[in-house]
Amino acid sequence: PGGFSGGDEPDGSGKFIATTFRNPRIAEQVNNLLKNRDGLMLGICNGFQALIKLGLVPYGEIRELKANDPTLTFNTIGRHISHMAYTRVTSVKSPWFANVNAGDVFAVPVSHGEGRFMADVETVKELAKNGQIATQYVDLAGNPSSDIEFNLNGSVCAIEGITSPDGRVLGKMGHSERKGENLYKNVPFAKDQQIFESGVKYFK
């Protein structure tokens, strides 16, 4: 479920998904998928909101969260944004990025009201050290940016996507699934991150 599940109030529909996944039976099977069956999980936009509310990113398991844990909150402009964003693959630790290289830049559509990644300095340092910062918003030169023209929601350290410690759970705001022939005109950079092809490749 996405869009405006639960009315998108008082926060994004990730809360709706997270509530479902906290059902003990479902939580048990999700943890089993990740810990015992070498599974993958991907959350895009509302899915990322759910993963971070559950603790699946950045911790790799469903857990109770603390007040200072990373979160996604309202965009700095205070409203929904729908735009093309330039994002750089910062780490290829995740199997979801098996078909691209660190440093590759893509143009990816974003559409959300609550996509601003927030975390304290120590948490960001730890994520960077572990290679868990998967993707970042960048300018036309490929550099992470705090400029609202490029970092559209105002995310800390321009972070667009993060992973679990082992990389098998990926959460990101950009809609990597919105790709196809002749969808975008006069937009620089590649559009296809080959995330889904990489996911299939993982199980072959």
Q: Predicted regions: what is each one?
A:
Residues P1-F4, C45, A67-T71, A119-K125, ...:
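A broad, low-specificity signal for short, low-complexity segments enriched in glycine/proline
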Residues P1-G6, N46, G113, G174:
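Glycine-rich His-Gly loop
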Residues V89-K204:
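C-terminal and late-domain segments of enzyme folds
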Residues S5-P95:
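Cysteine-nucleophile active-site neighborhood
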Residues P1-G14, Q132-L140:
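Amphipathic repeat-derived elements
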